[in-house]
C-alpha cells in the first residue's frame, strides 16, 4: 500500500515508522513499532458516596424499539447492575449517528467516567490518530468520514477491573440498539470484551484479527484496544494492518473510503 503524506504523519504519531522498499523492486511499505514509554498507571478513583448511589432496579423495557433520545435517557437512568452505584455518569457514545464506521470498545475508564465520552485521555488520542490515518474522525464530518464510538459497557467498573458477565449482559441490549440505529457499513471491535459481545467468541483478539467477520450482515474487523497498544507498542503495526483490512473492505461499498 502506498502511504500519502497525511497517513505517514499519522503513522508516526501512532509510533509506527514507515520505510519505502528499494526503487528497483515493487514498492512496499513496511511498518515497525517504535519504542514507546510505558503508559502511566491510572490514579485510584475515589469511592462513591453511599448517600448518592442509586438503588438497583430492572433494566428499562422496550430498548429494542427506542429512538436515540429514548435510548440515551434509558442508559442514563439504568440501574440494572451494581455498576450504577459507583459511576459519576454513564458513557453513552459519541459521533455522527449516521456514520458509515462504528468503533466498539470495552468499558469506560476513570477519565471517560468523569467526562462522559468514550476513548479520552491517552487511549483516545491514540484512537484519534489511528482514525485520522484512515481519513476518519469523531468530530464534524460527512457520514462517510465519520465514526460513531461506543463502549460495550456504559458504566465504569471500579478500579478499571474487567467487566463481569452479568454487567455485559445488562448493557448488551443498549449496544445492539445503537448498532441498529447507526446502521454502520463497518464495525471495528476493539478488545476482547467487545468481541465477546458482538461475535459470541471467547477466542483471544490475536486469533480473531486479520480476517473479516460478520455481525448481523455488517462486516466486522477485530483489533487491539488502544489501551492495550499503549502497554504493548510492539502490536501497533498489527493494529494498523487491521485498519487497512477494514479500509480495503469498505472500498467496494463506499467510494469515499478510497479518496
Say what each PLM segment does.
Residues 2-259:
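A polyanion-binding, active-site-adjacent surface
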Amino acid at each position: 500500500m502506498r502511504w500519502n503524506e497525511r497517513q505517514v504523519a499519522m503513522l508516526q504519531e501512532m509510533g509506527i515508522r514507515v520505510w519505502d522498499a528499494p526503487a528497483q523492486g515493487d514498492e512496499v511499505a513496511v511498518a515497525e513499532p517504535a519504542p514507546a514509554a510505558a503508559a502511566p498507571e491510572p490514579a485510584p478513583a475515589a469511592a462513591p458516596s453511599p448517600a448518592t448511589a442509586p438503588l438497583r432496579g430492572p433494566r428499562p423495557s422496550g430498548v429494542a424499539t427506542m429512538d436515540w433520545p429514548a435510548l440515551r435517557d434509558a442508559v442514563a437512568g439504568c440501574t440494572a447492575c451494581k455498576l450504577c452505584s459507583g459511576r459519576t455518569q454513564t458513557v453513552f457514545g459519541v459521533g455522527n449517528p449516521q456514520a458509515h464506521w462504528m468503533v466498539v470498545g470495552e468499558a469506560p475508564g476513570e477519565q471517560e467516567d468523569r467526562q462522559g465520552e468514550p476513548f479520552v485521555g491517552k487511549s483516545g488520542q491514540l484512537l484519534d490518530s489511528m482514525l485520522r490515518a484512515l481519513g476518519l474522525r469523531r468530530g464534524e464530518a460527512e457520514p462517510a468520514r465519520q465514526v460513531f464510538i461506543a463502549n460495550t459497557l456504559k458504566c465504569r467498573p471500579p478500579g478499571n477491573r474487567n467487566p463481569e458477565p452479568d454487567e455485559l449482559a445488562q448493557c448488551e441490549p443498549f449496544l445492539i440498539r445503537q448498532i441498529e440505529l447507526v446502521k454502520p457499513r463497518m464495525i471495528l471491535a476493539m478488545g476482547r470484551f467487545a468481541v465477546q459481545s458482538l461475535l459470541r467468541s471467547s477466542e483471544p483478539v490475536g486469533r480473531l484479527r486479520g480476517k473479516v467477520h460478520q455481525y448481523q450482515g455488517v462486516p466486522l474487523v477485530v483489533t487491539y484496544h488502544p489501551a492495550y497498544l499503549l502497554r504493548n507498542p510492539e502490536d501497533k503495526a498489527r493494529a494498523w494492518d487491521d485498519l487497512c483490512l477494514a479500509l480495503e473492505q469498505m472500498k467496494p461499498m463506499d467510494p469515499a473510503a478510497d479518496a
